[in-house]
Regions:
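Short, flexible loop/turn elements at secondary-structure junctions
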Residues: 9-10, 35, 114-116
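Alpha-helical elements of the RecA-like P-loop NTPase motor core of helicases
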Residues: 13-16, 40, 124
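Short, well-ordered alpha-helical microsegments
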Residues: 12-16, 22, 119
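Conserved phosphate-donor/acceptor-positioning beta-strand/loop module used by diverse small-molecule
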Residues: 7, 18-46
Length: 171
């Protein structure tokens, strides 16, 4: 039976749509991480990727602040990310909506730190959730065959970068 894997932080709120489209039960893997760690990670990426002339766009957070005439600083960046039009709010709200609509049995939560600390154990849990057979993975020789254009999309060059070794790189 084919397995479709897609990523979108809003899928948790759209279970009936997904099931109507794929004509089978949806199973959604929900990555979770402490909010302070997410904010620190995004701020680190912003500081590591300063806007340069010729780039398609400024990072998506500062772009919003400039557009709304809000001073650019870390506090305002975090505030925007947590506001109803920010990506953290969007993710949290979509998950809440899915739970409120009774779809929590279709969700499997994967904590970032658990994945980094015990990747094979977490993947085994994911395989069990999906009804698939688990197999051993190598976490010291990773590659990404499908690069995303994060500069154009987010103004951040390494937002979805896959390192060759699975390890925590920022708090």
């Amino acid at each position: 039976k084919p397995v479709v894997i897609d990523k979108n932080r809003a899928w948790c709120a759209r279970v009936p749509f997904i099931e109507g489209y794929i004509k089978q039960e949806a199973k959604i893997i929900v990555p979770v991480r402490r909010i302070d760690e997410i904010l620190a990670s995004i701020l680190t990426m912003i500081k590591r990727n300063p806007f340069q002339e010729g780039q398609p766009r400024i990072n998506f957070v500062d772009e919003y602040l400039v557009k709304h005439n809000i001073p650019i600083n870390d506090e305002n960046r975090c505030q925007h990310l947590l506001n109803p039009d920010g990506i953290l709010w969007e993710s949290l709200n979509a998950t809440k909506l899915g739970v409120d609509e009774g779809h929590s049995d279709k969700f499997h939560y994967v904590d970032y730190n658990d994945l980094v600390n015990d990747p094979q154990g977490e993947l085994n849990k994911i395989y069990t959730f999906l009804g698939e057979e688990s197999f051993p993975h190598s976490f010291d020789n990773l590659s990404n065959q499908h690069r995303e254009d994060d500069i154009t999309t987010y103004g951040l060059g390494d937002m979805h970068e896959v390192h060759s070794k699975l390890e925590k790189t920022s708090s």
